[in-house]
A protein has these predicted regions:
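C-terminal luminal/periplasmic domains and tails of membrane-associated envelope-modifying transferases
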Residues: 5-237
């Protein structure tokens, strides 16, 4: 069967990332066992060199079986394909924010209804302008006044599956994040959807679009350092 075939192809010891890339770059079918943390940089090399890279087995938490062919009957289990697209995924709300010369936020949505005590998923579409520094994170929170907030903390971009230092101009990324809505700390009623991007633990990216206090699609920049913007409103029940 194909599993036995690719496991045999993966039996050669490859000590470095470059060795793995060269192994997969050949015309003959080739496979390799790699750590999950190596998938994104290897995928980036494959994209730049224009050779295929597939994940044949992602059942292990730490190790993946990758190959340069997709055998008959096999499915590509590459998690990067869940978050990286050539065209923008369609979400409920269109918007436009640009953070410096790195990335744009072009769409967003939350699962509704948003009910206190329940878990919901938020989604954001990003358009990459260039690679971002590693460790960059996103904030997508709901806010009513000073006290009622849902999901106030920054979290990893695109589930940490494809870190932003590997992005390239023209990439579209679908960011998903599941949120537990607090039962007691949040009041019912309309909440603003606020988006920002964090560069480091102590610094945020600055908004360059819109250039003023307001922009397309009813965007409103928070006063002050131009680090956060309101892109819309949702109801919390």
């Amino acid at each position: 069967d194909w599993q036995s075939y690719v496991l045999a192809a993966a039996s050669v010891a490859l000590a470095t990332r470059e060795a793995v890339s060269n192994h997969l770059r050949q015309q003959a079918p080739a496979a390799a066992l790699v750590r999950l943390s190596e998938l994104a940089p290897l995928f980036q090399v494959a994209r730049n060199a224009k050779y295929p890279l597939y994940v044949l087995d992602a059942s292990n938490r730490d190790v993946l079986l990758i190959a340069n062919v997709l055998p008959p009957g096999a499915e590509d289990q590459n998690p990067i394909r869940r978050v990286l697209f050539d065209a923008p995924p369609t979400l409920a709300h269109t918007t436009l924010l640009r953070f410096e010369d790195f990335v744009e936020v072009i769409a967003w949505e939350w699962d509704e209804p948003i009910v206190r005590g329940r878990e919901v998923e938020l989604r954001v579409v990003l358009r990459a302008l260039r690679p971002m520094p590693s460790g960059s994170k996103i904030t997508v929170r709901l806010q009513q006044g000073r006290l009622s907030r849902v999901n106030p903390l920054a979290h990893d971009l695109v589930e940490g599956v494809y870190p932003p230092q590997h992005w390239r101009q023209g990439d579209y990324l679908l960011h998903r994040f599941r949120v537990q809505v607090p039962t007691l700390e949040v009041v019912p009623g309309p909440h603003e959807v606020v988006i920002g991007l964090r560069r480091t633990e102590s610094a945020n990216y600055k908004l360059t679009i819109p250039e003023g206090d307001t922009g397309e699609h009813d965007v409103r920049v928070y006063p002050g350092q131009r680090e956060f913007a309101v892109v819309g409103e949702v109801q919390v029940w």
